[in-house]
Amino acid sequence: MSLATLDATQHPNLPQSSQTLFSAKATKKLTFEQIAQHIGRNEVAAAAIFYGQAKASPEDIEKLSSLLDIPTPVLEEQLGGFPDRGRSVEMPPKEPLIYRLYEIVQNYGYAYKAVLNEKFGDGIMSAISFSTKVEKETDADGNNWAVITLRGKW
């Protein structure tokens, strides 16, 4: 089992809560899937809390406190405010996987826009009323494929 960890030197702009959460995650040897199951969210949403990109509800804070053995007042202080979204990634991104996601939007962004406008009319897809998930598919030849679903209200 591989665990996502945090190298704070690679992410100097993340909030203090990121270090607190990732340190406890590593100590407990928990995956984001396990954390997500415990707090009742999907694993991308759980990871977004760890990176300071999603707001934790009071229920999330209680459940994370219990699961990770972090005192509730510490998490309330660190996660109680509003996230400062978007500050963690420099543009263009240097991390190869993040860059590939950026490249997908760079290469297909206008194509997505054209097709979405044809299907839905003028407008935008919400990133607020939004959900996303990651799944793994294995084809008949044994190759692994990443399936990323983006679901936003129009």
From Swiss-Prot:
The active site is at R100, E103, S126. One of its GO terms (biological process) is cyanate metabolic process. It holds the Pfam family Cyanate_lyase. Its EC number is 4.2.1.104. It catalyses: cyanate + hydrogencarbonate + 3 H(+) = NH4(+) + 2 CO2. Keywords: Lyase. Transmembrane segments: none annotated. GO terms for molecular function: cyanate hydratase activity; DNA binding. NCBIfam families: cynS (TIGR00673). Catalyzes the reaction of cyanate with bicarbonate to produce ammonia and carbon dioxide. Belongs to the cyanase family. This is Cyanate hydratase.
